[in-house]
């Protein structure tokens, strides 16, 4: 490749906007005749405006936590035996440690390297795990298919095909290693949930602690804790309203906060000790450890708090772009934080007695109250961002089948992924209040908070190493270099944080253990239940021996049988027809499953297939969601399903005609675009209330059932808003007679009504199971199932159309 092409590639990589520019290159006789880069002025301005706007918005969502760290870093660092070293050299060395920690981890590791490891624009621990599962067979999701690999979001653009290696084959071969990888990821997720407890507690308590000594009117510690608890209760109580209504204020608050602490830091440098600039040299780090020894190492638990919130840069990548997050950090966050830490160090070098409240003591008295108000607001913003991140991480665990079913509410019509989980919100509030009231000290809370944050960073480092090997397909030595460079720093900080376990560091370990236990029990029980279904599914031979009527009465209507199986017929079907020998004229086995991608495009969400011969009128529908997709109540699901099946019938007939074989192929699945109604052979017309009523009158439902449904629809807001449509076979199209008959049966069944059938399962351990398995299944898993949301609620099934079939699973 000529050198100028390398330069162009480098330019486009840096700008991250290759689709926004026009590049004209004229080459003559293998030499550069004319090299012209025409930047379209309007597109350039639009790009700059977009990046600037996203960078501005990222202040309120991404950097609220990181920007409030100056409230408590120096106090936590001097809380131990380092308090015995009150001299300028120690202060300078401590600031040098903070500066180089900010430079090496947030700036070098995350901004320059980790932000490149996005999963279709998404970031975070699960994004890395998802990338690994798609480029190697690491996934433990039970119902994966080869058709999932055909999703447009499955493989990264620009990444080569999957290559085999001894390490890859070794990890894929040993299931225990893949289980350990999942547990490693879940452990990091549990620590993020711990952040959702400790961040609001330490941020709000640190901000309110300024009231302890604003002058002669200082208030007691008990009142500080009480006021902090009131603020925390208000913060969690307002979560159900959604943050989008006040989110426009978040970024300005953090920007004002950053400018304030930056200016105050610069003032303190000039006013107290401008020699602090010398501490930018790493030489002071060496002097610091030579002077303090083990005591200096123990103080790293406090220095660690300077980078809490760094993981949010990667975790919240999906809401912004890598370029905007980089711009915000390099242009504002990094310089303002460095100035503030430098200013506090300059102040402390002349006022060592103020170390217990160094931030507020370093603020000029005339600016105390404005800074106090801004600090409190910034603490709330930082807390809000981590609470939202906790909701997101629980949703992702739910998608992996590693968390009990909870209610996920989409709080914003415009912001995708803005969710609220009531159960998690109230659990976080109770734990946060318990931490605030129990510890009552930011230093102790900081010990717990720091341990949780460094563990999450450590998990990211090792996952990034695997991504470098298996996704980026780089040399293993490069991955080892990454681990050595950053993992060694994090191990040093982790070792210091572990020493704080008796002084509050035990809290994140306990929280992580409890959440990990819940996740593992749920995953174990759900997988055992799935394996039971897989081993006891009905054979097609048995289905075929029954004939087209299935040996039962086929009543009008469509029966949707929900199952986790993507192949075969679940045992719930045989259990139902054995006890009630009647079923609907059209059967659809529906599987709602998760795939290891962040989002599944709407036009690729549905997979439709046929079960058995054509005259059986049995179909399969697989609905696929990504780990960031929110399964909202689809008001048009039934209409989409009918159109999708109709389109599949047409596609199957066309392929059969072209191949000359009219036998249906069992197991064949096709992606159906639900928004595209062409080629279905149907016409969908809006139906008014009168027409709808006429349609119901012609149906086979009894007068009592129609009356109950009418009352239910009036009381249910979601059903009353559903679009009423009527399907007709297009007369002008030339349709094969067999296809027309099948479409007519489908429409008659739709007019008769749709019934949802799900299993009401009771999971029990086998009699010969050991004690641990019996306890896990019969007590722990059973308790979680009884106290979480039912499958009908999670799947948004209308109660008036629901039939539950009881089954006992002996696993």
From Swiss-Prot:
Transmembrane spans: 53-73, 94-114, 182-202, 218-238, 246-266, 297-317, 327-347, 367-387, 419-439, 451-471, 476-496, 504-524
Record has NAD as a keyword: no
Biological process terms in GO annotation: potassium ion transport
Cytoplasmic side: 1-52, 115-181, 239-245, 318-326, 388-418, 472-475, 525-811
Cell location: Membrane
Bilayer disposition of the protein: Multi-pass membrane protein
InterPro entries (UniProt xref): K+_transporter (IPR003855), K_trans_C (IPR053952), K_trans_N (IPR053951)
GO cellular component, one term: membrane
CDD domains documented for this protein: Membrane-FADS-like
UniProt record similarity statement: Belongs to the HAK/KUP transporter (TC 2.A.72.3) family.
Descriptive protein name: Potassium transporter 7
């Amino acid at each position: 490749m000529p050198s100028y092409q390398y330069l162009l590639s480098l330019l486009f990589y840096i700008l991250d906007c290759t689709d926004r520019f026009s590049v004209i290159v004229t080459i003559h006789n293998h030499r550069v005749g004319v090299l012209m880069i025409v930047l379209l002025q309007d597109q350039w301005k639009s790009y700059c405006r977009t990046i600037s706007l996203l960078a501005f918005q990222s202040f309120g969502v991404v950097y609220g936590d990181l920007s409030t760290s100056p409230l408590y870093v120096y106090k936590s660092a001097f809380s131990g035996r380092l308090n015995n070293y009150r001299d300028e050299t120690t202060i300078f060395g401590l600031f040098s440690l903070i500066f180089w920690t900010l430079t090496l981890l947030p700036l070098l590791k995350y901004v320059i390297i980790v932000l490149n490891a996005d999963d279709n624009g998404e970031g975070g621990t699960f994004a890395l795990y998802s990338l690994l599962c798609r480029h190697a067979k690491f996934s433990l999701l039970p119902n994966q298919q080869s058709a999932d690999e055909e999703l447009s979001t499955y493989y990264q653009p620009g990444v080569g095909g999957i290559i085999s290696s001894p390490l890859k084959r070794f990890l894929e071969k040993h299931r225990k290693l893949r289980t350990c990888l999942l547990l490693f990821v879940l452990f990091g997720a549990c620590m993020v949930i711990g952040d959702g407890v400790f961040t609001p507690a330490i941020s709000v308590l640190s901000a309110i602690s300024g009231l302890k000594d604003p002058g002669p009117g200082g208030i007691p510690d008990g009142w500080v804790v009480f006021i902090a608890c009131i603020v925390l209760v208000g913060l969690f109580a307002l979560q159900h309203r959604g943050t989008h209504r006040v989110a426009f204020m978040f970024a300005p608050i953090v920007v004002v906060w950053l400018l304030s602490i930056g200016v105050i830091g610069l003032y303190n440098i000039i006013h107290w000790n401008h020699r602090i600039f010398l501490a930018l040299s790493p030489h002071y780090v060496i002097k610091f450890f030579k002077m303090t020894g083990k005591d200096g190492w123990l103080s790293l638990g406090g220095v660690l708090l300077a980078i809490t919130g760094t993981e949010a840069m990667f975790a919240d990548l999906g809401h912004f772009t890598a370029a905007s997050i980089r711009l915000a950090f390099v242009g504002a966050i990094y310089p303002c934080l460095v100035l503030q830490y430098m200013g506090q160090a300059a102040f402390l070098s002349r006022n060592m007695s103020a170390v217990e409240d160094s931030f507020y003591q370093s603020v000029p008295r005339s600016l105390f109250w404005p800074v106090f108000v801004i600090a409190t607001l910034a603490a709330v913003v930082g807390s809000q961002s981590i609470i939202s991140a906790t909701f997101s991480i629980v949703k992702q665990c739910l998608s992996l089948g590693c968390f009990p079913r909870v209610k996920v509410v989409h709080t914003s019509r415009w912001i995708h992924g803005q969710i609220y989980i009531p159960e998690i919100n109230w659990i976080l509030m109770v734990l946060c209040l318990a931490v605030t009231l129990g510890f009552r000290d930011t230093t102790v809370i900081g010990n717990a908070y720091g341990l949780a944050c460094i563990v999450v960073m450590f998990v990211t480092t090792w996952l990034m190493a695997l991504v470098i090997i298996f996704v980026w397909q780089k040399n293993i030595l490069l991955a080892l270099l990454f681990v050595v460079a950053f993992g060694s720093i994090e191990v040093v900080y982790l070792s210091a944080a572990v020493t704080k376990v008796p002084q509050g560091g035990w809290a994140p370990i306990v929280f992580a253990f409890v959440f990990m236990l819940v996740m593992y029990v749920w995953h174990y029980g759900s997988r055992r239940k799935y394996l039971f279904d897989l081993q006891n599914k009905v054979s097609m031979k048995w289905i075929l021996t029954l004939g087209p009527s299935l040996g039962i009465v086929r009543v009008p209507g469509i029966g949707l049988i929900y199952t986790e199986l993507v192949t075969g017929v679940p045992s719930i079907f045989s259990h139902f027809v054995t006890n009630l020998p009647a079923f609907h004229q059209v059967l659809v086995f529906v599987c709602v499953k998760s795939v290891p991608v962040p989002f599944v495009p709407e036009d690729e969400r549905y997979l439709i297939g046929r079960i058995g011969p054509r005259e059986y009128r049995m179909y399969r529908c697989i609905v696929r969601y990504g780990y960031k997709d929110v399964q909202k109540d689809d008001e048009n699901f039934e209409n989409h399903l009918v159109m999708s099946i109709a389109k599949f019938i047409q596609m199957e007939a066309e392929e059969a005609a072209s191949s000359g074989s009219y036998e249906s192929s069992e197991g064949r699945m096709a992606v159906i675009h639900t928004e595209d109604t062409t080629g279905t052979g149907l016409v969908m017309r809006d139906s008014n209330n009168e027409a709808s009523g006429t349609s119901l009158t012609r149906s086979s439902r009894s007068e009592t059932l129609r009356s109950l449904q009418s009352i239910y629809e009036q009381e249910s807001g979601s059903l009353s808003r559903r679009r009423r449509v009527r399907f007709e076979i297009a007369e002008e199209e030339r349709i094969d007679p067999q296809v027309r008959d099948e479409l007519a049966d489908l429409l008659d069944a739709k007019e008769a009504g749709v019934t949802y059938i799900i299993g009401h399962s009771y999971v029990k351990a086998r009699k010969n199971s050991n004690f641990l398995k019996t306890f896990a299944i019969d007590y722990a898993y059973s308790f979680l199932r009884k106290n979480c949301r039912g499958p009908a609620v999670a799947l948004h099934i209308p109660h008036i159309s629901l039939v539950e079939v009881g089954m006992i699973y002996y696993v």
